[in-house]
Amino acid sequence: MPRLILLRHGQSQWNLENRFTGWVDVDLTDRGEAEAAKAGALLAEAGFRPAVMFTSVLKRAQKTGAAALAAAGLGDTPVIADWRLNERHYGGLTGLDKAETAAKHGEDQVHIWRRSYDVPPPPLAPGGEYDFTTDPRYAGQPIPDTESLKTTLDRVQPYWDAEIAPRLKAGEDVLIAAHGNSLRAVVKLLFAVPDDKIVGVEIPTGNPLEITLDAGLKPTAARYLDADRAEALPVLP
């Protein structure tokens, strides 16, 4: 049975600063780099040897995955990066301090933007500091100017169906090094988590989530490799 590892990037600089990051290409902190290395040790301990790593185009995910693979002695694993595994686009909240945003707009409104399934933040204004339309990584792509978790899932699912699922169905083990919300989307797909429950699923930084799948890609077992930093998992479908 194929195994899938979901690995959220290690702590980033803006995680530390409590800012809405989204698609901004911030780096890992020293703690984030240590989390990535520990993730690799856990992969080695679990005997996990992925045929491929899928990741986003953002360096905090790419560096986490690469460091984990290197620490596991798997540095030659093929890597495929795609923007559809990026973090959720936080629109007009991008770059803002979360506490200051709550003080300005009210905690209830910010909670809705952050934790509702289908309500996106205000769109990102064009031409500003965080306008991604001129970034060559997204040239010719229909990139959003804001996203909810639902619309994040809407871009993750076609990529999953076309690129990731076929590798698993072929019996290959796969690593996905990505972000809290793009990985939530994968968890929702696999575990059929209801809309009102998926927003409460927490995925800790740098802790590999191992999911064992049957031939139809239905989860048969799931566990965090670092039990001391584990979060609650959805019920197996």
Locate predicted features.
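Phosphate/ATP-binding catalytic cores across multiple sugar-kinase/actin-like superfamilies
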Residues: 155-170
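Loop-to-helix element that buttresses phosphate recognition and phosphoryl-transfer chemistry
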Residues: 11-71, 142-158, 200
